[in-house]
Structures are given as structure tokens and as C-alpha cells.
UniProtKB/Swiss-Prot annotation:
Protein name per UniProt: Transcription initiation factor IIB
Residue ranges of the TM segments: none
Function: General factor that plays a major role in the activation of eukaryotic genes transcribed by RNA polymerase II.
Binding-site positions, Zn(2+): C14, H17, C33, C36
UniProt KW keywords: Metal-binding, Nucleus, Repeat, Transcription, Transcription regulation, Zinc, Zinc-finger
Intracellular or extracellular location(s): Nucleus
GO annotation terms (biological process): DNA-templated transcription initiation; mRNA transcription by RNA polymerase II; RNA polymerase II preinitiation complex assembly; transcription initiation at RNA polymerase II promoter; transcriptional start site selection at RNA polymerase II promoter
Family: Belongs to the TFIIB family.
Taxonomic source organism: Drosophila melanogaster
Zinc finger (TFIIB-type): 10-41
Disulfide topology: none
Keyword Metal-binding: yes
Length: 315
């Protein structure tokens, strides 16, 4: 009985028409008496499903009851003040256009972050990187931005370096030249910013190896698996035998692809490989020259030669 009394006490009703049903206006958040129109409750929460608004809908009513998703990386929780349209003459400028409609106030820090996040997303789209890498790059940029350790470096340079680091950390490394191709920053500046970012965040990245690039390079060159496996084996053996000391993994991978392709029927030129790997022809030749005298030891035993080793190009 006591329970029933408590329920009765908590019941919302019109004081003039307690028995009249109430109309719930979820858009306004009000409960209205159906008899006299009195608002007897406000701030009603709609527990129904959310609606989306599409740009081609002609109705002026927006069924959405919430704004865009919050971004936890922004300092203000992604909340900002929006000034709606006014009704008085002071709300319009000399040309009759609304002065303040949809004007948004946002901190300079958040504006800087949003601009950098857009740049990271744009670069990632152009080289087909997944959202997981974009999210990691955004987090790295946020840490650098909050730490204020890279003063004097442009946001574009920091964004490019963070995207490069994110690729390395996610196990899908890209070369500096690939990042530079979709960035507004020079390769040299990205390299500098990369080192400064690692130092500022007190983090590290795994060393890149020839295997990190082999699959992608061979796929872009339209080479079959047989050539890819041979090139991977050649590059790995060359490193293990210390044939190419001081050479970058990218140049070793490119030279190994050149050697494997020249021994098969799927031959690729130094220029074709260089364009894909982002290295100069002379760089490929220098690594190939070191590897050629040991070619017999570098190829896998089951490789089917179309061109014998003694007929391979000599530099």
C-alpha cells in the first residue's frame, strides 16, 4: 500500500485536470495537459531510437535530438557554443545578412587539433591507410600538441611525422617519400620532426626490415608470388651474410626484387622498381652490385630460373 502511495505522489498530472491524459512532446522535452494545454513537465528524455538527417530531406524539422559525436581528443569535449538566428534589426548587417547565425565559439587549441586531424585523415586517404592508423596518428599528435615540445615546427610537419610513426607502430610502415608525396612538407623536414617526436614522447618504433615492404612493392609491380618469395629470400640472406652493410632496407628490397625479376620471365627495370620503392636507379645499382657476386648463395634452392645466374645483368 505504501508503495502505491509513493507512486501516486510521484505521478505527474495537471493540477486542474488530474484525470486528463498528458501529451508528451519529445522534441521540446515537455509534457502537456491535453485538456488545457498547460505544460506540467519539462526536460523529458526520449528513450526511443535516434534519427538521422539527410541533406536531401526537404522538411524543415530536424528529427535528430543530439549533435555530432564527441571527440575525446579535444580539450572542450567537442562542445562549443553556437549562436542561433536573431529576430531584431541588430541581428542583421548592412546587407541584410544574419550577423551571428551559426557562429561557433571554439578554443584556438581545439581549432588547431581539428585542422591537424583533417590533414592526417586526408593524407591517410590518399595512400589507403585504415582508420586504426588515423586514430593512432591523431593520438600521437594530441600528445605532441599538449606537451608543447615541438615549438617552431608547423602542424603539417608534426601531422606528417605522427602519421609515419603510426604506420610503423601498426606494422604497416610507409617510406618517408610516400608520406612526403601526400604531404605539404619536405622529406627532410618530416625526418627531422620524426626524430624530435620520438624524443618528445619518449617512445620508439621497431626497426624496419626488407620484409616490411616486399609484399607491397611486388604487388604494385604486378609480380607473381614466386618472384616475391625469391626476392624476400634474397634480401634476407643478403642481410644475414652482411653483404649490404649500411644499405637501407628499402634499397636492399628494391635490389632483391630486381635480381629475382631478372632471373624470371617477369622482368622489371630498375626505373620501374625505383618508381614504386621511391629510390633512385643508382641506389638500386649500388646494392645490386654488392649482391651479384653472391647470387648463387642468395637464391632459394627451388627457384626456377628463366635466365641463369651467369646471364644476369652485371653492373
Amino acid at each position: 500500500m505504501a508503495s502505491t502511495s509513493r507512486l501516486d505522489n510521484n505521478k505527474v498530472c495537471c493540477y486542474a485536470h488530474p484525470e486528463s491524459p498528458l501529451i508528451e512532446d519529445y522534441r521540446a522535452g515537455d509534457m502537456i495537459c491535453s485538456e488545457c494545454g498547460l505544460v506540467v513537465g519539462d526536460r523529458v528524455i526520449d528513450v526511443g531510437s535516434e534519427w538521422r538527417t539527410f541533406s536531401n530531406e526537404k522538411s524543415g524539422v530536424d528529427p535528430s535530438r543530439v549533435g555530432g559525436p564527441e571527440n575525446p581528443l579535444l580539450s572542450g569535449g567537442d562542445l562549443s557554443t553556437i549562436i542561433g538566428p536573431g529576430t531584431g534589426s541588430a541581428s542583421f548587417d548592412a546587407f541584410g545578412a544574419p550577423k551571428y547565425q551559426n557562429r561557433r565559439t571554439m578554443s584556438s587549441s581545439d581549432r588547431s587539433l581539428i585542422s591537424a586531424f583533417k590533414e592526417i585523415s586526408s593524407m591517410a586517404d590518399r595512400i589507403n591507410l585504415p582508420k586504426t592508423i588515423v586514430d593512432r596518428a591523431n593520438n600521437l599528435f594530441k600528445q605532441v600538441h599538449d606537451g608543447k615540445n615541438l615549438k617552431g615546427r608547423s602542424n603539417d610537419a608534426k601531422a606528417s611525422a605522427c602519421l609515419y610513426i603510426a604506420c610503423r607502430q601498426e606494422g604497416v610502415p610507409r617510406t618517408f617519400k610516400e608520406i612526403c608525396a601526400v604531404s605539404k612538407i619536405s622529406k627532410k623536414e618530416i625526418g627531422r620532426c620524426f626524430k624530435l617526436t620520438l624524443k618528445a614522447l619518449e617512445t620508439s618504433v621497431d626497426l624496419i626490415t626488407t620484409a616490411d615492404f616486399m609484399c607491397r612493392f611486388c604487388a604494385n609491380l604486378d609480380l607473381p608470388n614466386m618472384v616475391q618469395r625469391a626476392a624476400t629470400h634474397i634480401a634476407k640472406k643478403a642481410v644475414e651474410m652482411d653483404i649490404v652493410p649500411g644499405r637501407s632496407p628499402i634499397s636492399v628490397a628494391a635490389a632483391a626484387i630486381y635480381m629475382a625479376s631478372q632471373a624470371s620471365e617477369h622482368k622489371r627495370s630498375q626505373k620501374e622498381i625505383g618508381d614504386i620503392a621511391g629510390v633512385a636507379d643508382v641506389t638500386i645499382r649500388q646494392s645490386y652490385k654488392l649482391m651479384y657476386p653472391h647470387a648463387a648463395k642468395l637464391f632459394p634452392e627451388d627457384f626456377k630460373f628463366t635466365t641463369p645466374i651467369d646471364q644476369l645483368p652485371q653492373m
